[in-house]
Amino acid sequence: MKIKLICVGKLKEAYLRDGIAEYQKRLSRFCQCDIIELADEKTPDKASHAEKQQIMAKEADRIKKKLGQRDFVIALAIEGKQLASEQFSHLLSEVTVKGYSDIAFVIGGSLGLDQSIKNRANLLMSFGLLTLPHQLMRLVLIEQVYRAFMIQQGSPYHK
């Protein structure tokens, strides 16, 4: 199985890079986990709605180039479905049973995701109504992916 985390924006903080690298290493015994960073567009102060839509559309074009036609796409969006860790683990297991070998998680930029990406997604997923920095969300997501595999293994990590 191959998991891709497609993220808009560059990760700047060393402590987040270190945490993500640790979980990538842990995940390597279960799957290949690639993190793909895409350039984000600069958002001008007081950007109009139309300008924001253009920015999200440009970022969406970059995202689409990294999505495979046969990827199971999970886009993170505040309006998405909230899952408990056990449900998330079951979902990842079910995705592979259905014949998908590649799962792509998409984290948008500071403005969120363009509707075209949400439409392409097999699932919109939310980690709740909290607002988190997109860079921190990468660490939270990769930890939950690792946790999902540990749940499948019956590991005490989840306790």
Swiss-Prot record:
Cell compartments where the protein resides: Cytoplasm
Main location: cytoplasm
EC number: 2.1.1.177
Pfam families noted in UniProt: SPOUT_MTase
Key word Acyltransferase present: no
GO CC term, one of those recorded: cytoplasm
Protein name (record): Ribosomal RNA large subunit methyltransferase H
Binding positions (S-adenosyl-L-methionine): L76, G108, F127, G128, L129, L130, T131, L132
Stated role: Specifically methylates the pseudouridine at position 1915 (m3Psi1915) in 23S rRNA.
NCBIfam families, sorted: PRK00103.1-3, tRNA_RlmH_YbeA
Keyword list, A-Z: Cytoplasm, Methyltransferase, rRNA processing, S-adenosyl-L-methionine, Transferase
Alphabetized HAMAP family for the sequence: 23SrRNA_methyltr_H (MF_00658)
One example GO MF annotation: rRNA (pseudouridine-N3-)-methyltransferase activity
InterPro entries: Alpha/beta_knot_MTases, RlmH-like, tRNA_m1G_MTases_N
Entry's family note: Belongs to the RNA methyltransferase RlmH family.
Reactions accelerated catalytically: pseudouridine(1915) in 23S rRNA + S-adenosyl-L-methionine = N(3)-methylpseudouridine(1915) in 23S rRNA + S-adenosyl-L-homocysteine + H(+)
